[in-house]
């Protein structure tokens, strides 16, 4: 299947890849309001309110269109499973950063920072600098929205507006990053939006910017991502939902995330870092969710991304 992407595409926060960041924020907002939240992100709803009405609000909406539930009876379970997945993913990266900075690392790099407000909501140790890299318009939306609400970062936050397909290492250095000191990195929700060659280049660049003791966490693609049956089921489901929403709410477009992804064979992320001198731990998404007490219901387990959570430390 061809992708809707181009080599130098960019987007507003309500468009293309930007809209997916709002969808993730919606899941974090729903989790934050839940009875026993795994994570607390008080800024997620702020972003949703600023962006206005859109399909990205589904996760945090009080109820879905009844016609949608009638046509897709398991969609409430699907939504809850995705909220649990996003909450588990967020908790994983939150803990990873706090463990690294607790061990003395004072430089953090968030690749494709999106709308996660870690710079504002995590208890960073004094003296920590957090570099957030993303498309300029995404960072502008985040900064202006939080500034309007009087929110102040809990660290020395440095925005690096750059496309990760361009020369972001130079932009990072120009922003003050010290490649001679240990650092901690994250690549969350990023891999499917990169071609295989761009993924390899991303890791090569991280390798060139890190020293012993540095740490990297990656949400890597699992075997299910390229599985023909899984892809066919995903397409069929999206076809049904799009057709239904076109009838009941034609002004609300349902984005096709799979048209934004690159379905290409690529090297296993854990193996890549293992070959390049890193100690690696890999946790499948179902194990991660179970470990946080958030397993997906059996009826919708196939709906949850089968991603792998890679944590690596450079020797």
Curated annotation (Swiss-Prot):
Which Pfam families does the entry link to? LCM
Q: Any keyword Nucleus?
A: no
Check the record and name the Gene3D superfamilies matching this protein: Vaccinia Virus protein VP39
- Which GO terms of the molecular function aspect are on file? methyltransferase activity
Which InterPro entries does the record match to this protein? Ppm1/Ppm2/Tcmp (IPR007213), SAM-dependent_MTases_sf (IPR029063), SAM_mthyl_Trfase_ML2640-like (IPR011610)
Which SUPFAM superfamilies does this one have? S-adenosyl-L-methionine-dependent methyltransferases
Report the EC number(s), separated by commas if there are several: 2.1.1.-
Q: Which chain positions lie within coiled-coil regions?
A: none
One biological process term from GO is: methylation
Keywords, sorted A to Z: Methyltransferase, S-adenosyl-L-methionine, Transferase
Question: Where does this protein hold S-adenosyl-L-methionine?
Answer: 134, 163-164
Q: Report the family membership.
A: Belongs to the UPF0677 family.
- State what this protein does: Exhibits S-adenosyl-L-methionine-dependent methyltransferase activity.
This chain belongs to which protein, by name?
Answer: Putative S-adenosyl-L-methionine-dependent methyltransferase MAV_4557
